[in-house]
Amino acid sequence: MTTVDQYLSAADHAMQQGQPPLALQLLMAALAAFPEHPDILSRLAIDAYRRGAMREAIAYFERALAVDESPGNRCNLAMALCDVDRYASALQTIQALSERQCEDPLIQFTAARAWRGTGNPERALRAISRAIDAAPEDADFRLLRAQISVDQDHWDSALTDIAAVPVLRLSPFQHYRLCGLLMQTGQFTRAMPEYRALVARAPAYAEAWLGLAAACERANDLDGMQDALTRVQVLPLNSAQHAGVNQMQGKLASRRNDNTSACRFLGAAYEADVSDPLWKSQVGFDYGQCLDKVGRYAEAWQVFNTAHATRNRIKTDAAGDHQALDFFALLRVPVSGHWPALAAPADHRPDPVFVVGFPRSGTTLLEQILDARDGLVSFDEQPYLPKTLLALQNDGIVYPSELAALDAQKREQLRNYYFKQTEALVPDRDGRRLVDKNPLNWARVPLIRALFPQAKIILALRHPCDVILSCYMQNLRSTVLG
């Protein structure tokens, strides 16, 4: 009689010989002979997982766990459940084990995925940090913690983890995730060479070409965007990838003021059968804007309504700094009408120019005008001042009522923290004055006055009806509203 080990060994040999169908046939024969053996069930689950048959894989993992509640079987099942977005089931499977085996990095990694998927970023961050403590060189662990940080707008923490990822040892998929994180943190010019390195080693990776096109568009390299789209269109594409190409083609046409073509491309993307609601909503906003530009107002309004409804159905549980940075909480706090005159700081760094206003009121245009002038340098909209406010509050200082009590040392410490953040995008100012464009910083004017007494504040004004309509036409996604 053939033993379990003999079946598994024969299946291994078939895989090594490049015969996956034979390997599966041997595993099925083994299952017929030993229907409840956990090793056979696990191997069948892994085989199904590799084939992308996730429902089949989960069924085998569940059967394996039913006969052998080993940590490995429990972790494998939870990981597969995460892969199909069944995060609540994954958490139920892994939570107790993760609390017992805090030092096992893979278990903590799996638990972190489940916690993140169920909307508990704090627990996710604790779990993934334990995994990294045990295995600091693991790229997947670093990338997940960076993603959790990005989810919460903790960009500085995310960039720290990204910098620790060994890029040269990444798989193409890991490299693609790293590129995506750079895009999410506004590092477009850093993302472009990473995408180019990725497509050089994996030229058939369609999503990487699309990512490169998106990075080029954000960096205003329209020729690079066109080249990436030309390259990706010669590849065999599935329906979702075709939709992605249409989206990028539409954005390129729009940037070139060919709104008729943009509507055609974006309309095709919008009508595509793609299940990702986040992507679908973004395409809706892009399409609606093009419809508006060509005068198809009723259609545009309908598309915007659908895009908002799709966006609102997405579960958003981002917490992070939300309580401390919440814009509306700032508005509820009374501000003293007394504005004491403060002496210029002794560090001789010129105080920034702050461009504020309501979103869609023209702040970006003002920023671009200022950035074009000698002696000024701007950076992409960043939460540097909100983060500085958070640092102040974390020190137990009540904002804004206790600002007047700040001593010179604390002011200097907070100024240093603000300027240190700006170095991520402006490492060498060469004496130039920073232009900080973050529209809703007008709610933080008391902090600006306290830390940057020589700062200039420019308020952009636009008719409120235009502002509200323009905001409705945008996919405004900030978790902390500036």
Regions found by a protein language model. Name each.
Residues D5, D39, G72-N73, L106, ...:
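Start-of-helix register in tetratricopeptide repeats
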Residues P35, D68-E69, C102, P136, ...:
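Short coil turns that delineate tetratricopeptide repeat
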Residues Q152, T185, V199, Y205-E207, ...:
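PAPS-dependent sulfotransferase catalytic domain
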Residues Q16-Q17, R50-R51, D83-V84, G117-T118, ...:
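Register position in tetratricopeptide repeats
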Residues Q282, A298, Q302-L414:
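PAPS-dependent sulfotransferase catalytic core
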